[in-house]
Amino acid sequence: MSINLVKGDKINLSKQRNGLSKVMVGLGWDEVEKTGFLGLTRSVPQDIDCDAFAILLDYDGYLINQNSVKECTVFFANLSWPGGSIQHMGDNLTGAGEGDDEQIFVDLDAVPNNIGAIVFAVNIYEAFKRKQHFGMIRNAFIRVVDYDLQTELCRFNLSENYSGKTALIAGGLIRTEDGWDFMTDGASYEARDITDVVSLFLR
């Protein structure tokens, strides 16, 4: 049975599912519909391109490579970490459809030992140029799925008011002596792009 989490919750995934070795982290959202003139015309969704990405940190919570933001990030322009232990499954340009809008696969057993945490975040592509923000998004969530059994382990619904914000840190996987924890976050920022978000973790 999946566990519904709130902001700041932490669970031990390895204890929840014995033998857990691979997870799929799914992130989803819906665009708020905008109504036509006087509400008389058919409503259409906002054309908002949200991008999910993973940030790779050391055991102190900093980027594993202080000299290259790209080498610390798995995203639409860098879909796979060398060796394939962390893979972005592709960019969804519209957020249309049910379920996960973007997914990031993690082979927990194969994640290099120098990685102490994997943070999952979402930003709006060209948000400032297009004058878009997360107040135009609804039903945002992050969930963790047992990849082998295809069963959901936990879910965090990002239900706060994020109006004016262009990036969210949804949660993260944290390596422990017992395996891996998942911790929710929910912090929001006014970021121009992915680099702005990743740079938060520079020393």
Q: Which residues are covered by each model-predicted region?
A:
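Intrinsic-disorder/low-complexity signal
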Residues: 1-203
